[in-house]
Amino acid sequence: MLEHGGRLREAARRYDIPLADWLDLSTGIAPWPFSLPAIPEQAWTRLPESDDGLEAAACLYYGAERVLPLAGSQAAIQALPRMRRGGRVGVLSPCYAEHAHAWRQAGHLVREIGEAEVEPYLDSLDVLLVVNPNNPTGRVFEPAELLAWHARLQRRGGWLLVDEAFMDCTPQSSLAACSNRPGLIVLRSFGKFFGLAGARLGFALGERPLLQALAEQLGPWTVNGPVRHVAQSALRDRQQQRQQRERLLAASQRLEELLRRHGWPPAGGSALFQRLVDPRCAALHDYLARRGILTRQFEQPASLRLGLPADEAAWARLDAALLGFKEPAHE
């Protein structure tokens, strides 16, 4: 199983720091969760029903013709590779590692390619996978470029799979409105923007036959009743959505400025995180962890991803820790 951010208990054991004393910046999850509605008893006592309004709320929010609710977009990441015969899959990298892993596990020939390699390789691929905005680089691809790639793939029966887990603050770059086109699949994550990662909810957007085939792969009742109720409330709450976007964008800019001020100019980022690429990243990760601040470390290349502090105390704590790193004699 691949390693992910958010492994706070493991860090607490490794660094011998109590769980409650940590500042977790290792995930790209909004630190301000949407308010939770009261959950009616029948959400617990009855089996979930697909016509309860969740799909309609998601279609309206994403601007999509059809959606399939998932137990997190991870469910589709693992199921989609089993819906095609073994073929050649290009994964625009670096990106969320589960994508390449899932296609390899299903027997496909996977090539992780850079942005400059898309054009020369595209006509030899059966599937191209793009994370947009990219995790961890923050790179955003414009719809016109992605749709041009899709058209070339679709002519040969290929797929363009776009993971838009971090798209909520930049909806103008989404392909959701085009997701009814054959061979185009869009994945959306609920937990990151809404700050409710524990709900384990995501959506696949695509044409009807493909979503029906994916539903057959996943089986019934993939999303439980309480989560369906909570998600409908959040997906329809335009005021909270607007406030969340403004807050996230402001916090991301503040984090970029804080890092830059301490001599760590970000190499990219999104509304939910900033990325550092520097040979000293491993040392910074360990230094911060020894002070109870958890970040997400990557090795190829040496880099760190930092999520957003939730409050002024957290901002001050990160500020002080970064200041201390400039003084190695104190270590």
Curated annotation (Swiss-Prot):
Q: Which family does it belong to?
A: Belongs to the class-I pyridoxal-phosphate-dependent aminotransferase family.
Instruction: Name one molecular function that GO assigns to this entry.
Output: pyridoxal phosphate binding
Function field: Decarboxylates L-threonine-O-3-phosphate to yield (R)-1-amino-2-propanol O-2-phosphate, the precursor for the linkage between the nucleotide loop and the corrin ring in cobalamin.
Q: What is this protein called?
A: Threonine-phosphate decarboxylase
> Cellular component terms, GO, for this chain's entry?
cytoplasm
Q: In which pathway does it act?
A: Cofactor biosynthesis; adenosylcobalamin biosynthesis
The UniProt keyword set, sorted, is: Cobalamin biosynthesis, Cytoplasm, Lyase, Pyridoxal phosphate
Q: Which InterPro entries match?
A: Aminotransferase_I/II_large, CobD, NHTrfase_class1_PyrdxlP-BS, PyrdxlP-dep_Trfase, PyrdxlP-dep_Trfase_major, PyrdxlP-dep_Trfase_small
Q: Where in the cell is it found?
A: Cytoplasm
